[in-house]
Amino acid sequence: ALETIRADIQQGLERVANLDEDRILSAYVNLIEAILRTNYFQQHSPQQPERLSFKIDCAAIARMPQPRPMVEIFVFSTRVEAIHLRGGLVARGGLRWSDRPEDFRTEVLGLVKAQIVKNAVIVPVGSKGGFIVRRLADCAPNERTEEVESCYQTFIRGMLDLTDNRDHNSVIPPPRVVRYDQDDPYL
């Protein structure tokens, strides 16, 4: 079934006459094919907050600039947008609230590079995450801290939605997540 869908998409791309449109559509197809996990199928549960998370294989994205982390988790909701970049299966880093909505991914990528240099002796690869609060300007000054903390929690939950768990020596995948990668109980 998947090969049929790919063939249909390829046929559609062959009908695109404009070079820019072809590049853009091909990049979207490439991005979709690089998705390793999503929490999309968890969204239909009444207990699950509204957020969408994707784990992406950065090496599989043709147009992603260097340096490429091993994986990127992208979390999106109406209140927060977040990413977590990780250079390897075991990586050391942190999370931060960014005030740069236009280029927070660039900011986080720069922090990952610094983390790699800083931790080269301890752990050879780094990780870093960042998030922006989408509605902060709508909050009264006394509500801002609560909004930032709530968005941070949504970010963490979005990553945990995709992350395998451990029970002694067993790895337990998250419910209703189709995995196209190896076990990854990173968090």
Question: Where in this protein do the model-derived segments appear?
Answer:
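Extended, well-ordered protein cores
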Residues: 1-187
